């Protein structure tokens, strides 16, 4: 199982790195992360997730759900993709979404 997971991540390395770099190159402050949201949600949609934007009344928030059959465990993940004013992504938030 572990090796399968590593192979799956490795197969996406170029795409995920490019996504993180794109978000890094276009830092957006909190509640203004339209570019980052689009990058992340486009990837998730293409990967078979059902994506809902504007979650919780926050225009740049989103919720993505992947269904794999009925029942079973549920896993929740959270990522931040906002930048710091005058510092950009010194916080590393540009990597959270692609890493998850």
Where would I find each of the regions flagged by the language model?
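Acidic/His- and Gly-rich active-site-bordering loop/insert found
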Residues: 2-100
């Amino acid at each position: 199982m572990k090796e399968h997971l590593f192979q799956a991540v490795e197969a996406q390395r170029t795409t995920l790195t490019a996504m993180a770099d794109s978000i890094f190159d276009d830092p957006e402050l909190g509640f203004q992360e339209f570019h980052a949201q689009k990058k992340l949600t486009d990837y998730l949609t293409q990967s078979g997730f059902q994506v809902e934007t504007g979650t919780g009344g926050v225009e740049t928030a989103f919720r993505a759900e992947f269904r794999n059959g009925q029942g079973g465990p549920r896993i929740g993940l959270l990522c931040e993709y906002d930048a710091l004013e005058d510092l950009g992504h010194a916080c590393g938030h540009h990597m959270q979404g692609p890493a998850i």
